[in-house]
Amino acid sequence: MFIYCSFFCFRYGGKYMQKQFYPVIGTEKALPFYIIGIGVSCWQFPVSRPEGYDYPQLFVCLEGEGEVTVDGKTVKIMPDSIFYIPPHCPHEYRATTHSWYLDWVCFDGKQALELLKEWDLNKFHVFLNCGAERMHKLFDSAYYTIKSDKAYGNYYASAQLYDMLLEYRKLSDDKFPYKSRVNSEAVAKVMKYTEENYSKPIKLADM
C-alpha cells in the first residue's frame, strides 16, 4: 500500500506539477538503505523544526531562492544547489522569493547513517552551483520507481538512493560530481563500443 499526493500548484502560481510520495514501509526495514518519503519539483513552504527531524534529508534546489538556518547560521540557497540536513538537527528553511522549488528525500536503513558517518558527511552541508542536474534525475527516477511498483518499488529505489548518497559524497570530494559523472559515462560508452567492435574498423565518428 502506498500513500502519495500529486497536484498542480496553481494556488501558489507555480509552473511545476508537485510530486510527493510516502511509501508504507514494511520489509524494506531490512534493507541497508530505503526511502521514507520523496518529493520532486515541490513548492516549498516555510518549515521550522526546533527538535530536528527523525530522518536524514537531502535537497536539490531547482528554482527560486531560499535560506536554511542551522545552529544560528543562515545560508542562502540558490538554484543548482544541494544541501543535506542530518537527523535530529534543529533547523528552519524558507523561501526568500515568491516561489522556491526543491527536490527532497528522507531516508533510513541499517547502513545509511553508518555510511554517512564513515564518509564524515552526517552533518549540515550546502553545495552551491554544483551541477545538480544529475541529482535531480536520480530523484525523478526514484520517485517513479517507487510509484510504479507497489511490491518492489522501494527495493529498486534503494539502489537509486545509494547513487544519490554517492553523488553527495562526490560533491564533498571535488564539488563537481555531475561533470565527473558525465566524463565517466562517456569513457564507459567508448570502452563498451570498442570491446564490442574490436574486430571491425572503428571510426572516430562512431564513438
Model segments located where?
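Short, Lys/Arg-enriched, Trp-marked, Pro/Gly-tolerant hinge/linker segments that flank
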Residues: 123-133, 146-206
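Ligand-binding loop in jelly-roll beta-barrel domains
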Residues: 87-111
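Amphipathic, well-ordered alpha-helical segments in soluble domains
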Residues: 34, 57-60, 134-138, 160, ...
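Juxtamembrane segments at transmembrane-helix boundaries
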Residues: 48, 115, 142-145
